[in-house]
From Swiss-Prot:
Gene3D superfamilies: NadA-like. The lineage of its organism: Bacteria, Pseudomonadati, Pseudomonadota, Gammaproteobacteria, Pseudomonadales. This is Quinolinate synthase. Belongs to the quinolinate synthase family. Type 1 subfamily. It comes from Pseudomonas putida (strain GB-1). GO terms for cellular component: cytosol. Iminosuccinate binds at residues 48, 69, 140-142, 157, 227-229, 244. Keywords: 4Fe-4S, Cytoplasm, Iron, Iron-sulfur, Metal-binding, Pyridine nucleotide biosynthesis, Transferase. SUPFAM superfamilies: NadA-like.
Length: 352
């Protein structure tokens, strides 16, 4: 990690702290005020699984959406609301704006970014792509609008395997960016010819196989759930590997009563909601930076607070804008992803 991104991480972590935690009464007041503003402004709140539980609960109770980044994009595009509040990180807000440029897209804070986005500047990535013009460019959704505009395909972790497999079946070779661990996992699963960008998620990269094996010894009957942004040695210990939505599904379907979960702890809200009779344990990390990386929670996701949600609704200042010149280029790979996954859904339902 560069010194610049490390400093940004520290600042994000500090900004996320709430010096005066809300009382139950204050929290209820914020939730009521936000619900009223959403209704008055014909707005909808979409939240990622990694947001704090109170934000996820608020999205659910106000008719919004709690999901992975793929379903967030689909929900925001299809919902009739004039304004979409995206509780997540900046690339999610940009994606919503690209798909529905006619809508107003707000975020609780525009400072909520992503280490994968920061680690893939468009100038450097474009130069890398230009060196291999014969390859199909596939980028993870955790990238800027400018990087998406340079890509042929955008994927999320829930559909990346299937899309890469389809491209491989067509004889295409691939440039993959920016998450090296997810790229390596896909490469290993599919056998695709892929050149990998050297990026990583600051949360998932902190999971360590030795500590995970030690924890497994403490919980011998537990199943290990791992997000594929984790290092290869961690993935090798998993009983199930997948996106956030896929890990939640695994928690529901596997017979185990205890799960060791190697992803952001924000996902525990939905897992515990759907599986109240099961126990979920945070996988150990080994963070040693200036910020609190030893606890598995994205500091930028933590910046989505009730106060900021209400503030962005009342002031409208944290609005997402995307360069109009980028939108026609960026929407093509995004729509390819949405069309591909929709076709896969229809095929699956037809075979049911």
């Amino acid at each position: 990690m560069t010194q610049i991104s490390e400093r940004l991480l520290v600042q994000a972590h500090l900004d996320a702290k709430q010096p005066n935690p809300l009382t139950a009464e204050q929290e209820a007041e914020y939730r009521a005020a936000i619900a009223a503003e959403l209704k008055a402004q014909n707005a909808v709140l979409v939240a990622h699984y990694y947001c704090d539980p109170v934000i996820q609960a608020l999205a659910e109770e106000t008719g919004g959406c709690v999901s992975d980044s793929l379903e967030m994009a689909r929900f925001g595009k299809n919902h009739p609301a004039e304004t979409v509040i995206v509780a997540g990180v900046r690339f999610m807000g940009e994606t919503a704006k690209i798909l529905t440029p006619e809508k107003r897209v707000l975020m609780p804070t525009l400072e909520a970014t992503c280490s994968l986005d920061l680690g893939c500047p468009v100038e450097e990535f474009s130069a890398f792509c230009d060196q291999h013009p014969e390859r199909t460019v596939v980028v993870y959704a955790n990238t800027s609008a400018a990087v998406k505009a340079r890509a042929d395909w955008v994927v999320t972790s829930s559909c990346a395997l299937e899309i890469v497999e389809s491209l491989m079946d067509n004889g295409e070779t691939i440039i993959w960016g920016p998450d090296q661990h997810l790229g390596r996992y896909i490469q290993k699963q599919t056998g695709a010819d892929m050149l990998l960008w050297d990026g990583a998620c600051i949360v998932h990269e902190e999971f360590k196989s030795r500590q995970l094996a030690d924890m497994k010894a403490l919980y011998p009957d537990a199943a290990i759930l791992v997000h594929p942004e984790s290092p290869e040695a961690v993935i090798e210990l998993a009983d199930a590997v997948g996106s956030t939505s896929q890990l939640i599904k695994a928690a529901q379907t596997l017979p185990n009563k205890t799960f060791i979960v190697a992803t952001d702890r924000g996902i525990f809200y939905k897992m515990q909601q759907l599986c109240p009779d099961k126990e979920f344990v945070e996988a150990p990390t080994a963070g040693n930076g200036a910020a609190c990386r030893s606890c598995a929670h994205c500091p930028w996701m933590a910046m989505n607070t009730l106060e900021r949600v209400l503030d962005c609704l009342r002031k409208g200042g944290d609005e997402i804008f995307v360069d109009p010149a980028l939108v026609p280029k960026a929407i093509k790979p995004l729509n390819r992803m949405l069309d591909f996954t929709q076709a896969a859904r229809l095929k699956l339902s037809g075979n049911a």
